[in-house]
């Protein structure tokens, strides 16, 4: 009789608890918690959206959101690859827009702000010159500020991005993450050879 009770709980041949049951249960609970957090986050910090390609601004080649901002790099309709100038728009939590034209051939990787470097790394990825540049740049910035601790004001501060990349590489090396280390190294090597 006792064996029949076990079979009724989980099916024929399964013991209790079923393999993986706790993991599936934990995932559902985590997903429920995340869904419940979204309205609170939007209500307290404002709603941010990724801005995409449009007729007025052009093709979006890079777009991201942070704690209190949204940032998009547009390739204008009159874009000339020989003179790569991009339109960058930054939205703050109040919906105010800052617009800037960035000539990526003039970006100083050892002394520029996040906006110019994001435009430059987006250009390198979109053009195929360094396909992993944008991803490596975003992750290096997250390594410095945390996943979502960068603020609108942080976008305008001047940084030595070569040092930021080297710090991110060292973090990956110390953690034993060879792939992460090599992803940063590819971008850093490209910048060193330009």
Which residue stretches match the model-derived regions?
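Type III/flagellar secretion export determinants
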Residues: 1-194
């Amino acid at each position: 009789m006792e064996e029949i009770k076990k079979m009724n709980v989980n099916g024929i041949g399964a013991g209790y608890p079923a393999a993986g049951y706790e993991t599936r249960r934990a995932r559902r609970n985590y997903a429920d918690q995340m869904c419940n957090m979204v309205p609170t986050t939007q209500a307290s910090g404002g709603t941010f959206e990724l801005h995409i390609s449009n007729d007025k601004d052009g093709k979006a080649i890079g777009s991201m959101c942070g704690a209190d901002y949204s940032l998009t790099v547009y390739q204008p309709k009159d874009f000339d690859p020989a003179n790569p100038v991009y339109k960058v728009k930054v939205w703050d939590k109040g919906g105010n827009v800052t617009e800037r034209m960035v000539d990526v051939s003039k970006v100083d990787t050892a002394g520029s702000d996040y906006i110019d470097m994001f435009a430059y790394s987006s250009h390198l990825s979109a053009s195929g010159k360094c396909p992993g540049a944008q991803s490596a740049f975003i992750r290096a910035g997250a390594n410095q500020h945390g996943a979502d601790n960068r603020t609108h004001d942080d976008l305008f501060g001047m940084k030595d991005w070569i040092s930021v990349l080297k710090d991110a590489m060292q973090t990956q090396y110390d953690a034993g993450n060879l792939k992460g280390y090599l992803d940063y190294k590819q971008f850093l090597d490209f910048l060193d050879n330009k």
